């Protein structure tokens, strides 16, 4: 399959995708309820989409094309409320979070679709281990070349996105010590990591064709990059976030990405360069391991500061962009979170410490999602 033509989209529109956990109300383990929930929701009126994912123990909700933070918040809230109402008759719980705290990957099944069965055959047990839950945000780009500029410019802020959304401290019943352990599962795939440093669509097309000719990839879906262009939508897709525990936080983070994109496209505070990636993996690891307390190394100035402080350092520059986009509330929420440094991973650990039961932690995560 050749690379699709980069579709025209309205610049700075955005869309949000959230992968959610489906658990039974008996022991709060993951359970394959997606087909039942989708049947229960058939005919329900809502914007956006609700659809199955790689495992029937997870489900994805996504907005339509959004112009404002408030629009995304309303669309996701409606879908959340419909799903929570439908789940009651199924004795089903729905939760955010990047990983389920104690599920065993060997117990998972793969959804019966050609794409997911292909992934299972190709990647073996990695497909079942990929029962992790992420937030993806699409940002509309004014042109194909601008999409690559934005992809690499916003890459500096990947540690922000990871740390703000981090909600996966537990894997198979064990506290990993990470704020976001989910990204370690993604890293096992061969086409993960960062996109190649290319700033023109012609150069990117040539790269894609070389990769396709090797037989390693067939389409853009085979790249599991942290940020990837989506030519069929005319967007870039930011893919590093855990699914937060609430719709509110998911929308705050999406709006933060949108306002950063506006700042980068209009103000051009720097030009992306290959050397930006010298500290990319280190900064990303720090965000995964320590969350907002992680260390951020500036790729040009070589200064060091906590990720939370780096977020706070950019907030003032984002005020006019947040105001223009109608997302000052979201910026205030992001600023407050960075000041407190108490994200979803910290909340999960505190609940688990108080309850001394991961089942109770999942139950409370379900309540938090529904609230």
UniProtKB/Swiss-Prot annotation:
It comes from the Bacteria. GO terms for molecular function: ATP binding; glutamate-cysteine ligase activity. It catalyses: L-cysteine + L-glutamate + ATP = gamma-L-glutamyl-L-cysteine + ADP + phosphate + H(+). One of its GO terms (biological process) is modified amino acid biosynthetic process. Keywords: ATP-binding, Ligase, Nucleotide-binding. SUPFAM superfamilies: Glutamine synthetase/guanido kinase. Its EC number is 6.3.2.2. Signal peptide: none annotated. PANTHER family: GLUTAMATE--CYSTEINE LIGASE 2-RELATED. NCBIfam families: gshA_cyan_rel (TIGR02050), PRK13516.1 (NF010040). Belongs to the glutamate--cysteine ligase type 2 family. YbdK subfamily. ATP-dependent carboxylate-amine ligase which exhibits weak glutamate--cysteine ligase activity. This is Putative glutamate--cysteine ligase 2. It comes from Cupriavidus necator (strain ATCC 17699 / DSM 428 / KCTC 22496 / NCIMB 10442 / H16 / Stanier 337). The lineage of its organism: Bacteria, Pseudomonadati, Pseudomonadota, Betaproteobacteria, Burkholderiales.
């Amino acid at each position: 399959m050749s690379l699709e033509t980069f579709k025209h989209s309205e610049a700075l529109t955005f869309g949000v995708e959230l992968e959610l956990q489906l658990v039974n109300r008996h022991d709060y383990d993951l359970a394959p309820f997606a087909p039942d929930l989708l049947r229960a929701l058939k005919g329900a009126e809502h914007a956006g989409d609700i659809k199955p994912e790689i495992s029937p123990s997870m489900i994805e909700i996504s907005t339509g094309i959004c112009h404002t933070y408030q629009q995304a918040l309303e669309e996701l809230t409606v879908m959340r409320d419909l799903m929570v109402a439908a789940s009651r008759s199924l004795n089903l719980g729905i939760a955010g979070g990047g990983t389920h705290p104690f599920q065993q990957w060997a117990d998972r099944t793969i959804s019966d679709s050609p794409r997911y069965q292909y992934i299972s055959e190709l990647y073996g047990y990695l497909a079942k281990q990929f029962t992790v839950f992420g937030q993806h945000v699409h940002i509309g780009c004014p042109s194909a070349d601008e999409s690559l500029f934005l992809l690499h410019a916003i890459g500096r802020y990947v540690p922000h996105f990871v740390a703000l959304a981090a909600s996966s401290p537990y894997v198979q019943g064990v506290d990993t010590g990470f704020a976001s352990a989910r990204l370690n599962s993604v890293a096992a795939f061969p086409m993960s990591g960062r996109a190649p440093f290319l700033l023109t669509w012609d150069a990117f097309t040539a790269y894609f064709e070389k990769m396709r000719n090797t037989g390693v990839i067939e389409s853009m879906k085979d790249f599991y990059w942290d940020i990837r262009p989506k030519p069929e939508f005319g967007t870039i897709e930011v893919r590093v976030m855990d699914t937060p525990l609430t719709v509110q936080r998911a929308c705050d983070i999406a709006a933060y990405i949108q306002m950063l994109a506006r700042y980068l496209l209009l103000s051009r505070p720097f030009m992306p360069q290959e050397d930006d990636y010298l500290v990319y993996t280190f900064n990303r690891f720090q965000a995964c391991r320590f969350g907002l307390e992680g260390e951020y190394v500036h790729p040009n100035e070589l200064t060091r500061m906590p990720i939370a402080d780096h977020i706070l350092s950019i907030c003032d520059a984002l005020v006019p962009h947040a105001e223009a986009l109608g997302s000052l509330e979201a910026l205030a929420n992001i600023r407050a979170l960075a000041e407190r440094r108490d994200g979803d991973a910290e909340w999960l650990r505190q609940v688990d410490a108080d309850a001394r039961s991961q089942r109770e932690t999942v139950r409370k995560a379900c309540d938090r999602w529904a609230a």
